[in-house]
Amino acid sequence: MKATVKGRYEGDKATAAATLAFTPSAADLRFKASATDAAFARGPSLEGLILTLEKPGSFLLDLKPHSKDVRFQFMNSALLLDRRVSLTYTHSTTLSPGPAKLPARTALDGSLTFDPANKLSLSHTLGSSGCRVKYSYAHGQDRLTTIEPCFDTANNAWDFAVTRKFQGGDAIKATYQASTKLLALDWTRDSKIGASFKVAASFDLSDQSKAPKLIAESTWNYEI
């Protein structure tokens, strides 16, 4: 059994989340229970609790008992002309008899991997007027630098992301959303003791009077 504890600090707010994952030795299914601090803030409750059943690379089922929201996800991949093609179908809905807080949503995601350095991805939400097309290019022999331009056809806008990995588990990522003029910088570090850390800052370039938004996260993994 594996346990994960995550802490997040955003401005003057601090949140926490915990996940327990259990994989039967005779099966390739995985059971997970995740809870945020909302499940304990006002005494034990189902708020913030997510139950997950998954078979990695095949399907995933998420259930939020408090709101009765359900998410189904099915994925598959195959070789086509020596190129890896991956497809993911995601449907989100609610089992609550009352009016749904969020409408049902169905999304299709596909990717075509040309080689270890080049991949093309496409995302489309059924009923929407457009899709997102992303190209990923990993530069260099060790592919430590990744460049990812993305075009949103619905908003006719580009997003750009550049990630640089370093020896020792450090990585720096910069993203820019042209439609919102939002610039984000992330620094992450993976520790050899089963922990990871992330510090992020975002800047609203459309209103430079706004202070940058700062976020710090820490994640700890344990074997039980």
From Swiss-Prot:
<feature type="topological domain" description="Chloroplast intermembrane">
    <location>
        <begin position="12"/>
        <end position="16"/>
    </location>
</feature>
<dbReference type="GO" id="GO:0046930">
    <property type="term" value="C:pore complex"/>
</dbReference>
<dbReference type="GO" id="GO:0015288">
    <property type="term" value="F:porin activity"/>
</dbReference>
<feature type="transmembrane region" description="Beta stranded; Name=9">
    <location>
        <begin position="155"/>
        <end position="166"/>
    </location>
</feature>
<keyword id="KW-1134">Transmembrane beta strand</keyword>
<keyword id="KW-0813">Transport</keyword>
<keyword id="KW-1002">Plastid outer membrane</keyword>
<comment type="subunit">
    <text>Homooligomers form large rather nonselective pores in plastidial outer membranes.</text>
</comment>
<feature type="topological domain" description="Cytoplasmic">
    <location>
        <begin position="179"/>
        <end position="180"/>
    </location>
</feature>
<keyword id="KW-0406">Ion transport</keyword>
<keyword id="KW-0150">Chloroplast</keyword>
<dbReference type="GO" id="GO:0022843">
    <property type="term" value="F:voltage-gated monoatomic cation channel activity"/>
</dbReference>
<feature type="transmembrane region" description="Beta stranded; Name=8">
    <location>
        <begin position="131"/>
        <end position="140"/>
    </location>
</feature>
<feature type="transmembrane region" description="Beta stranded; Name=7">
    <location>
        <begin position="117"/>
        <end position="126"/>
    </location>
</feature>
<feature type="topological domain" description="Cytoplasmic">
    <location>
        <begin position="65"/>
        <end position="70"/>
    </location>
</feature>
<feature type="transmembrane region" description="Beta stranded; Name=1">
    <location>
        <begin position="2"/>
        <end position="11"/>
    </location>
</feature>
<feature type="topological domain" description="Cytoplasmic">
    <location>
        <position position="1"/>
    </location>
</feature>
<feature type="transmembrane region" description="Beta stranded; Name=5">
    <location>
        <begin position="71"/>
        <end position="80"/>
    </location>
</feature>
<comment type="similarity">
    <text>Belongs to the plastid outer envelope porin OEP24 (TC 1.B.28.1) family.</text>
</comment>
<feature type="topological domain" description="Cytoplasmic">
    <location>
        <begin position="29"/>
        <end position="32"/>
    </location>
</feature>
<feature type="transmembrane region" description="Beta stranded; Name=4">
    <location>
        <begin position="56"/>
        <end position="64"/>
    </location>
</feature>
<feature type="transmembrane region" description="Beta stranded; Name=6">
    <location>
        <begin position="102"/>
        <end position="111"/>
    </location>
</feature>
<feature type="topological domain" description="Chloroplast intermembrane">
    <location>
        <begin position="190"/>
        <end position="212"/>
    </location>
</feature>
<keyword id="KW-0812">Transmembrane</keyword>
<dbReference type="InterPro" id="IPR034626">
    <property type="entry name" value="OEP24"/>
</dbReference>
<dbReference type="GO" id="GO:0034765">
    <property type="term" value="P:regulation of monoatomic ion transmembrane transport"/>
</dbReference>
<feature type="transmembrane region" description="Beta stranded; Name=11">
    <location>
        <begin position="181"/>
        <end position="189"/>
    </location>
</feature>
<feature type="transmembrane region" description="Beta stranded; Name=3">
    <location>
        <begin position="33"/>
        <end position="42"/>
    </location>
</feature>
<keyword id="KW-0934">Plastid</keyword>
<comment type="function">
    <text>High-conductance voltage-dependent solute channel with a slight selectivity for cations transporting triosephosphates, dicarboxylic acids, ATP, inorganic phosphate (Pi), sugars, and positively or negatively charged amino acids.</text>
</comment>
<feature type="topological domain" description="Chloroplast intermembrane">
    <location>
        <begin position="167"/>
        <end position="169"/>
    </location>
</feature>
<keyword id="KW-0472">Membrane</keyword>
<keyword id="KW-0626">Porin</keyword>
<dbReference type="GO" id="GO:0009707">
    <property type="term" value="C:chloroplast outer membrane"/>
</dbReference>
<feature type="topological domain" description="Cytoplasmic">
    <location>
        <begin position="141"/>
        <end position="154"/>
    </location>
</feature>
<feature type="topological domain" description="Chloroplast intermembrane">
    <location>
        <begin position="127"/>
        <end position="130"/>
    </location>
</feature>
<feature type="transmembrane region" description="Beta stranded; Name=2">
    <location>
        <begin position="17"/>
        <end position="28"/>
    </location>
</feature>
<feature type="topological domain" description="Chloroplast intermembrane">
    <location>
        <begin position="81"/>
        <end position="101"/>
    </location>
</feature>
<feature type="topological domain" description="Cytoplasmic">
    <location>
        <begin position="112"/>
        <end position="116"/>
    </location>
</feature>
<feature type="transmembrane region" description="Beta stranded; Name=10">
    <location>
        <begin position="170"/>
        <end position="178"/>
    </location>
</feature>
<feature type="topological domain" description="Cytoplasmic">
    <location>
        <begin position="223"/>
        <end position="224"/>
    </location>
</feature>
<feature type="topological domain" description="Chloroplast intermembrane">
    <location>
        <begin position="43"/>
        <end position="55"/>
    </location>
</feature>
